[in-house]
């Protein structure tokens, strides 16, 4: 058999070798250096900075998916099949079979030399601006609104004029409060510490997250090509439901910036997580079905319907509240009877699964908050319930770990991203440990179940056993049977036959198991 060789002079062979060569070249080249010395590479990989700009007369931003830019690259053809980040769009989102989650990117303007100064850190604090907030207002469970109950029955909208069953409460005692407003083309998260439910106790701070899309594409290509095995192993762990909650939350918060194979793995892991907790009533089948359909934003699937509230006489804010956590999300659709788009095929599929007003409240949370939910600090919310996550810096409200911000920073060498690989390996170690622990617990449960079955059989059958000695020689407590000196070692069976068994060791061994 002749050895297969690549013809470097023409066709796909030349393109493959070119991609491999250029990958090693950009491995040690920052985004800004590549834009200065090899702009054709940025253009080839869809990372051309000139595609996105707000300067008049410059090319407008094209609404394409990243996989279209990468389809010529052989190295990541299977790995990077689709990167489903959706681009900022001023038009109202169209609800179809699968919702398009908007990811807002920072639009940088060019200077006179057509250069962009990318900030070294993608998060900055901006001056606080006093704005209308729902502080000092009572909360009511969203599920307690009468029109929410009417939605389940599909009653006419005229019925909402009937007596309202809402009631006021506020479970919040103290802790962090977050506010997510409608901000066109900006990612802002307001936070403060509150000592009680009446308002702010510390000066609020507003952080802005500034992801630059071409830089993200460039870094993603470098990272996914360099650490391909680690990302694939992570995908397998997520798909097989072998990731603990901390690992799952870590990568859920990066969902919008991951390629499609990791996004699909995250949806599978989340749906498995929810399905395991349906039996205890924490979540419902509605959430499991919606997760399998990739409906809405993945962060809100960890919110229990009991924690969803709204405000008295206010239909454009929704709140997620626990004893030590409070988040106000400004809705893009008003909380009204006709908020649910019943013409959406996916919602039509989910509607038969809604059996309570609380489930309807969760569906309203998904539909009405729209893309604002993408920045819900789910790690802070989860930590008030589980306490499994370590305290984080306020600058990490957007993500779980500080190393995650490296995806959005311009670094010269690929070695500067080693901390990302370190975190990936730590997550994989946690997954392995979680698998071993869960297997040990499963075996222990099986052993305990066998013991309980044995005890139950003894309790049900002990009265049918005829002992060849007087009954007063046995204490009546079945749970602690003790034997005096047996008269014989013969055991009378149901068919009146006898078998020679060491009776005392047998029963004591069975009951002590």
Swiss-Prot record:
<dbReference type="GO" id="GO:0005774">
    <property type="term" value="C:vacuolar membrane"/>
</dbReference>
<keyword id="KW-0472">Membrane</keyword>
<dbReference type="InterPro" id="IPR013903">
    <property type="entry name" value="Meiotic_expression"/>
</dbReference>
<dbReference type="GO" id="GO:0051321">
    <property type="term" value="P:meiotic cell cycle"/>
</dbReference>
<dbReference type="GO" id="GO:0005794">
    <property type="term" value="C:Golgi apparatus"/>
</dbReference>
<keyword id="KW-0926">Vacuole</keyword>
<dbReference type="Pfam" id="PF08594">
    <property type="entry name" value="UPF0300"/>
</dbReference>
<comment type="function">
    <text>Has a role in meiosis.</text>
</comment>
<keyword id="KW-0333">Golgi apparatus</keyword>
<keyword id="KW-0469">Meiosis</keyword>
<comment type="similarity">
    <text>Belongs to the UPF0300 family.</text>
</comment>
<protein>
    <recommendedName>
        <fullName>Meiotically up-regulated gene 133 protein</fullName>
    </recommendedName>
</protein>
